[in-house]
Structure formats: C-alpha cells, structure tokens
Amino acid sequence: MKAIILAAGLGTRFKSEKHKVLHEMLGKPIIWYVLNYIKQSNIVDIALVVSHKKESIIEALKHENVSFFEQANPKGGTADALLSAKAFFEGMDDYILVTNGDAPLVKPDTIKGMQRFLHMVEEYEKIKVGALVLSSFLPDPTGYGRIVKNGKGDVIKIVEEKEATYEQKQINEVNGGVYMFYVPYLKEAVKHLKPSEKTNELYITDIIEIMTNLGYTCRSFMASEITEIFGVNDRWELSFAESVIKMRILENLARSGVTIHSPESVYIEPDVQVELDAEIFPNVVLKGNTVIHKKAKVMNGSYLENATIKEKATVLPMSYIKNSTVEEEAIVGPMCHIRDNSVVGKGSHVGSFVELKNAKLQENVMAKHLSYLGDVNIGKKTNIGAGTVVANFDGKQKYQSYIGQKAFIGSNSLIIAPRNIGDFAFIAGGSVITKDIPPKALAIERAELKILEDKSKVKDE
C-alpha cells in the first residue's frame, strides 16, 4: 500500500505567513504527526501534494523519504489535488491511502484496522472494496459531510452539509477525511469527475457516488475515537489538537507505570521517554529527547529539554536543565540552571540559584547555594561554598578549570580560569584565585582589613 497526503490548501483561516501544516504542536509540525501515523502503519511509500508555499514544506521535510507532487491550481479541489499525484499510483493493483495534511489525530491502530478490514472483506466476500472511508458518529454533525448508506450498510455517497437534504442532515455518521481506494477502480472513477457547479472544484467525496454508480462496493470504518476525524483549520483547532495529543502521551505514560500529578498542567513532547515509577509533578515541561529514568522525580514547574535524569535522581521545583545529565540519586534545585553538556554526578547536590555551564561534577559534589560554575571539572566529594564563581571568560575566550576531589572551596571565592585546584586543597572564603593551587594546600587571598575610627559617612541623627 502507498499513501498520498494532500497538503496543497491555502490555510487562510490560520492568518499566518507560515504554511498551515508547518505549525507546531508539542514541538513537531502538524505534517510530522500525519507522516508518523502513516509510517507506524507500515506504509513507507508516501507522496505529498503541495502548492501554496511548497518550498517551505519541501525544506522542512528534506530528511523524510517522501515524493512531492505539485497541484497547479490550489483552488482546484481535493480530487484535483489527488489527480496531481496520478503518476504516483499509475500501474498499481493495490489500495492507496489518501489523507489530509491537516489531520494529525488519526491513530496508527486505526489505519492498521482499515487495512485488516480490507483483507477480511477480500478473503470472506471475495470482492475488492472501491473505497473505505474513515467515519465517526457525532452528537452534533453540523458542518461535516454525511455518510449516506443503502439498506445493506454500504456507503453510496458522501453529502456535504450545504448540499444535504433535511433527512440527510439527520444522519450522525460523518466523513473523517481518510480514504483507502482500490487503485484500478479509482482510476476508472476519476474519469467521471465533474467540477462543482457552485465552486468549480473537483471533490474527492464525489468519487464515492461515482464508484457506487459503476457498481463498486464502498464501506465505512469507524474511528476508535471521535477526535481522530478532527482537522486543524485555525489556531484554536491547533490548540485543541495539541491538547488531545498531549493527553494521549500522558495517558500512555501513566498506564505504563509513571505517576503524573495534575496531568492537565504537564507538557510532554512525543520524543520524551519516562520510565517505570518515575514521578512528574504539576506544571513540568519535558521537551526534545529528554529521558527520565526509573524512580526519578521531576517536581513542580521545572523545565527540561534534551535532559537525562538518571535513576532515583530528584529535580526540585523551578529548575531549568538543557542538554545535560543528572546522574543517579543526585539532587538539583530548587531554582537551579544546568546547561551546555553539564553533568551532575551520582549523589551530588546542586542547589538554589546555582548555574552550571559545561560543568562536570563527579560523585557527591556539594554546590548548594548561589554559585556560577562554568567550564569546570570538579572531583568527587568536593564542597563548593555559597557565592563561588568560576570565571571562565576573559572577554575573548573561554577557559577550562579543574578542581580536584575532596577539595573545599570557601564561600564567596572567585576562581579565575584557567586554574587547577588540587585534591584536598582548601580555599579560604572570599579569596580570588589567580594561580594554580597544589594538592592539600591552604590558599588565602584577601585584601587587608582596615578599620578607620570615626570615618563613617552615616550621620547620627
């Protein structure tokens, strides 16, 4: 089976300079979700029909294995878009999936179910289905095309809302906009397409009635969820679709053994991995290729992007971690900033208002308060006092520093990179370190304290 995605529409209701299918939900463009459910259905030969702003779509999908076809007239209608890719299904004796580029909520299992249905009909009824239409029942079907059936339950046509009779408007089964056509029958049916008298467009839905008139059987297949048939036509529908996908992700994680508190407030992107017995608290954001390992906790309001949180580690509230790793049983936060390939070693603690930039902390390092540690490797069991700064930038270049194991860096110390601080070294609080400190040495660098009696400028009133 092959697949064709129709993405040639103008998308005027988005009111955007960007093509509709490139607007993002959970960090991925709409078209990514469409491609994803097709590929997860084991369909690898995929074509995309484009027109309006085609260059941006082609550029966005340059790493995808898809073929592109251009619809010369983007107002030609959905069937005209399909015919623009006629060369893609020329010579096929199989079914072809046709779906819309703005329909990201279809599930892979639904497409697989449609494929199985076609095989069952062929096996037991010994016929080819001309068209299988994804459908759903809506309590209020206003605005949707109605699925009209005969007494045997076969679909005989799809009637759009504006053309439906009163009786047809009472039908609650609606068109989901996803089709599987048997290509030999499709090629015969499109020969009989005629433009709409009202819009002069060629509609893909007209193919169903044409196939019926040619004697071909058409059927419908019920979507497992109503939301699967919802398209994305404006920014509000984009927000709704994003919330549907997000809740699917969260439900899947929860049913796989992850505790998620107040899931409506949690944001998790599709590529994020969360393992058994991990715990996610309210207002957490997990983006990119973030991985949360077993029994780890990410607490309220934390933002993680391409972060790895190892087993039993804890991210305390309001922490920001990007492109970095927190090792087993480490604690970070609250309100810390960890970035640029930093590593917090096993059992280490990085506390409030501590920033790590390309910093590598080995096991059991303590840096609990108000510090900036940039471009530095710190040995195990070293203590970093409050207010410590490793100054890594001289205005032109950044430099690397090394602090050994079991060193003690006193509060308010300033280490001017590049520096080597040896194992077991002790730096007294308030020191400015401009030289390397050998192992086991005590380093004190302070200006002499002067007390000038009666020189205070504070007036005694």
Curated annotation (Swiss-Prot):
It catalyses: alpha-D-glucosamine 1-phosphate + acetyl-CoA = N-acetyl-alpha-D-glucosamine 1-phosphate + CoA + H(+); N-acetyl-alpha-D-glucosamine 1-phosphate + UTP + H(+) = UDP-N-acetyl-alpha-D-glucosamine + diphosphate. Acetyl-CoA binds at residues 386, 411, 429, 446. In the N-terminal section; belongs to the N-acetylglucosamine-1-phosphate uridyltransferase family. In the C-terminal section; belongs to the transferase hexapeptide repeat family. Catalyzes the last two sequential reactions in the de novo biosynthetic pathway for UDP-N-acetylglucosamine (UDP-GlcNAc). The C-terminal domain catalyzes the transfer of acetyl group from acetyl coenzyme A to glucosamine-1-phosphate (GlcN-1-P) to produce N-acetylglucosamine-1-phosphate (GlcNAc-1-P), which is converted into UDP-GlcNAc by the transfer of uridine 5-monophosphate (from uridine 5-triphosphate), a reaction catalyzed by the N-terminal domain. Residues 236-256 are annotated as: Linker. InterPro entries: Bifunctional_GlmU, GlmU-like, GlmU_C_LbH, NTP_transferase_dom, Nucleotide-diphossugar_trans, Trimer_LpxA-like_sf. UDP-N-acetyl-alpha-D-glucosamine binds at residues 6-9, 20, 71, 77-78, 145, 160, 175, 233, 339, 357, 372, 383. This is Bifunctional protein GlmU. Keywords: Acyltransferase, Cell shape, Cell wall biogenesis/degradation, Cytoplasm, Magnesium, Metal-binding, Multifunctional enzyme, Nucleotidyltransferase, Peptidoglycan synthesis, Repeat, Transferase. Gene3D superfamilies: Hexapeptide repeat proteins, Spore Coat Polysaccharide Biosynthesis Protein SpsA, Chain A. GO terms for molecular function: glucosamine-1-phosphate N-acetyltransferase activity; magnesium ion binding; UDP-N-acetylglucosamine diphosphorylase activity. Its EC number is 2.7.7.23, 2.3.1.157. It holds the Pfam family NTP_transferase. The keyword Secreted does not apply. It comes from the Bacteria. Binds 1 Mg(2+) ion per subunit. It is an enzyme of class 2 (transferase). Mg(2+) binds at residues 102, 233. Pathway: Nucleotide-sugar biosynthesis; UDP-N-acetyl-alpha-D-glucosamine biosynthesis; N-acetyl-alpha-D-glucosamine 1-phosphate from alpha-D-glucosamine 6-phosphate (route II): step 2/2; Nucleotide-sugar biosynthesis; UDP-N-acetyl-alpha-D-glucosamine biosynthesis; UDP-N-acetyl-alpha-D-glucosamine from N-acetyl-alpha-D-glucosamine 1-phosphate: step 1/1; Bacterial outer membrane biogenesis; LPS lipid A biosynthesis. Residues 1-235 are annotated as: Pyrophosphorylase. Homotrimer. GO terms for cellular component: cytoplasm; membrane. Residues 257-461 are annotated as: N-acetyltransferase. It is found in: Cytoplasm. The active site is at 369 (proton acceptor). The gene is glmU. Its main location: cytoplasm.
